[in-house]
Amino acid sequence: MRYRELGKTGLKVSEIGLGAEWLERHNAEEVKAVIDCCEAQGINILDCWMAEPNVRSNIGVAIAGKRERWIIQGHFGSTWQDGQYVRTRDMEKVKPAFEDLLSRLGTDYLDLGMIHFVDEEAEFHRIMDGAFFAYVKEQKARGVIRHIGLSTHNPKVGVLAAQSGEIEMLLFSINPAFDLLPASEDINTYFAPDYEEHLGGIHPDRARLYQVCEQQEIGITVMKGYAGGRLFSAETSPFRVALTPVQCIHYALTRPAVASVLAGYDTPEHVLAAGA
C-alpha cells in the first residue's frame, strides 16, 4: 500500500481507503471480516457518514483495540430520525447524533470532522456563518476532532470551502463520468442515465476545484469513485464500456490534490480487487 499526505493536515493516508456505506447491509461478523481485510492490506482511513445505529456499532466493535491505526472521517449533520437517515442542520438533532457516532465507534475523537453533504452555495454560507459551524469549531478547540473537512458533490461549493481558510480538506465525488459534468446543486444530475453527446474532457468547474485545492493544499478524499457501481457495466456506464475498480481508482488518484479513494466493499474479495 502506498500513502499520501492529506493536504496540509499532516496526516498520511492510504491511497485506497474504506468508504463504509455498504457495510450498512451486513452483520457484525461480516463487517469485521471486511475491516480486518482492509487492515491486512494496509488501509488506514475510513469514512463513516451513515447515521444508522447498527453499522456505527459494528464498525466500533471491528476496530476495538485498534483505534490508533485508523484515521476516521466522521460527519456532523447525518442523523437517524424515526428509523431513517436525515441530513439536518438542526442543532438539537446534530449534537446528539455526533455524540452517538463517537460512542458507537468507541472513540473520544475523530481525525477528520466533516460538515456533511453541502451541495448548495447558499447553504454553505449559512452553515459557515451560523451555529452549525460554531459547534464544529468548538469540537476542534476541545480536541474532539483534529481537522475540519466538508463533503460535497458540487465543485463550486468545494472551491468556496477550499478558499474559506477554515476547511482543511474535502470529501468529493470523483470518477471519469462525473468529471465531464458542470457544477450542480442537484446530486441526481450526476446519475442521469445518459450524458449529452457533446460533453468531452474535464469540465472547467471541476478543473478549477482541483487547481484551487492543489494551490491551497486542501487534500481530497474521494467518494463515488465507482459512480455507485454503474461504471462497472457497459449498459449503465455513460461511456458504454465497462471499467474495472482499478481503472476507476487510478483515474481518481491522478487528479490533483487527491490523497485517497474511499471505495465501498461488501466482502473481503472487494477489498482485494480494489488493491490489485
Protein language model annotation of sequence segments:
Residues 1-74, 108, 141:
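N-terminal binding-site loop/beta-alpha segment at the start of enzyme catalytic domains
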Residues 5, 13-17, 44-45, 69-73, ...:
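Structural preference for beta-strand elements that scaffold enzyme active sites
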Residues 7-23, 73-86, 114-117, 226-230:
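N-terminal small/glycine-rich loop or linker at the start of catalytic domains
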Residues 17-29, 79-95, 121, 125, ...:
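Active-site mouth loops of central-metabolism enzymes
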Residues 25-38, 89-106, 152-160, 243-251:
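Short, acidic/polar
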Residues 37, 41, 105, 165, ...:
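Structural motif
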Residues 100-124:
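Active-site groove signature of glycoside hydrolases
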Residues 118-276:
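Beta/alpha (TIM)-barrel catalytic core signal, keyed to glycine-rich beta->alpha loops juxtaposed to Asp/Glu
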